[in-house]
Amino acid sequence: MKTVAALTLLAFATAANGQFLQDCTNALDGLYALGECEPQFLTCSGGIARIMDCPADLIYNEPLLICDWRHNVIGCEGSGESSGETSGEGSGESSGEASGEGSGEASGEGSGEASGEGSGEASGEGSGSGEETVENVCENLEDGAYSSGGCTTYYFFCTTNTARFLSCPTPLFYDADSQKCIWKSLVEECKEDLTITDGSGETSGEGSGEASGEASGEGSGEASGESSGQGSGEASGEGSGELEPTCEGKADGIHPNGVCSTNFLTCSGGIARIMDCPASLVFNPTILVCDWPRDVAECAGLPTPQPTCEEDGYFSFGQCSSSFTACTNGRAIVMFCPAGLKFSESTVRCDYESNVSECQETSGEESGEASGEQSGEGSGEASGEASGESSGEGSGVEEQNQCVGLDNGLHAIGCSPRVLSCQNGHVDIFECPSSLVFNDQSLICDYPQTSLKCLIEDTILIDETPIAAFDCSTDGLFSDGLCSATYHQCTAGQLINFTCAASNAVFSAANTECVDSSTLLQCH
């Protein structure tokens, strides 16, 4: 308890001074912010500092000690996409080439003014109205969870007239009756929207401003503004020459993206996203799932798509690079080493720069630091912390046999953040970011509620009760994650954060106390 109190005092002192820790010198074990609205945070354990990345689109929320949406972090609401894309009405009217809405400007129909009114992101008026909605949406409503209306993935919590906006993980939708994120087919409001639509007709210039500004704002607007005066804003930033579909006129949900395509279109709140099917599968518009080409009527007589990866394995992006490509069954997946590590193609692992042969020619630096992965080959634990993977070398027959009977590719290891990679008998183990688990249906790291294995194996941690707001209306102790050393206590409506004192201890929601991490299955 003394350790927890000291940690709390240190956090208050840091906030009062307006300073942020950059290393763990004289710091207690715990999590610390690296700055305001930062997508990374600092972890201190035994005096050792590690910089960790939040999942995509999230930033570190220091009061809650979690990665959170930008609009949920005080002071960061207006510093994200809305302020970074196009500020002011003039940008959409006169400088279309410099913004994501430029494609709409070129067409003459989807101009900056129209896209600003429709998307709420391109103009100051749009962002202002968004703030007004945040302040007034909970007026005269009781505290609790509410749907944003209709068939949607968005919902919000009301706590003392203050709104906290959230969205369901893809591809779930919010059900107002059960107050949970569930499959679209089970949501009453979505049943009338479950119709098959053709995704090939959305190519007009009217929707191009939204598509280029929201779905492919990184480069599509600029590319279309320069290459065409006819408003070819649908051209994707990847330069593929294909038309980028929009969600204009489409209900929230899943839609085809062409005929016999290896990807599909998802629409959520008018925002279009292209999702890839797993390797060797194409989208079946009849049942709205990825399926074998032989079972999709539209694929009859069409040539089989060629794989983007000729050989399975892991390949570096370049000499002394922290990025690498994982090729699995002809599909390329871009992966990244943890902060401070480089990918070694010769050893097929992330390692310190001094231990990567590809880095020696460029850096010439030699370090006496011992590699955490080498000492961790026997246990798999040190390797998982330092490089984001456990090589499995020397860990015994049991780990080598994990790939027996499994196809080449990625596989979930139960309801856990660990990912098993099988490549022609070679075993690798990767780890998802904190509080996420690997979903072997979608082949991505996702929230535990989306994993079928979590729903089957872990009935204690995966709570099927209706969603509750973080308003501490219920007294008790609550864990901050699947295998987390941090937890919080709610007493008379007040929230107090705690951290387990022992270095190897995590909080058990079932026992309502800190226990040794080796006793919990989800921590293995």
From Swiss-Prot:
Q: What would be one Gene Ontology cellular-component term for the protein?
A: external encapsulating structure
Q: Where is this region: Disordered?
A: 78-134, 196-248, 361-399
* Reported phenotype of the disruption mutant: Worms lacking cpg-2 and cpg-1 exhibit defects in cytokinesis during embryo development more specifically meiotic chromosome segregation, polar-body extrusion, osmotic barrier function and polarization. Embryos lacking cpg-2 and cpg-1 proteins have multiple nuclei lacking plasma membranes and may also have weak egg shells. Oocytes lacking cpg-2 and cpg-1 show cortical granules that are reduced in size.
Tissue spec: Expressed in the germline.
Q: Where is the Chitin-binding type-2 domain?
A: 21-78, 135-192, 244-301, 306-361, 400-456, 469-524
- Which residue stretches does the UniProt record annotate as biased composition, category Low complexity? 382-392
Ranges of Gly residues composition bias in the record:
87-129, 202-240
> What Pfam families does the database record attribute to this sequence?
CBM_14
Which PANTHER family does the UniProt record give?
Answer: CHITIN BINDING PERITROPHIN-A, CHONDROITIN PROTEOGLYCAN-2
This chain's function reads: Required for polar body extrusion during cytokinesis in embryo development. Affects cortical granule size. Has roles in meiotic chromosome segregation, osmotic barrier function and polarization in conjunction with cpg-2. Binds chitin.
What is the designated name of this protein? Chondroitin proteoglycan-2
Phylogenetic classification of the source organism: Eukaryota, Metazoa, Ecdysozoa, Nematoda, Chromadorea
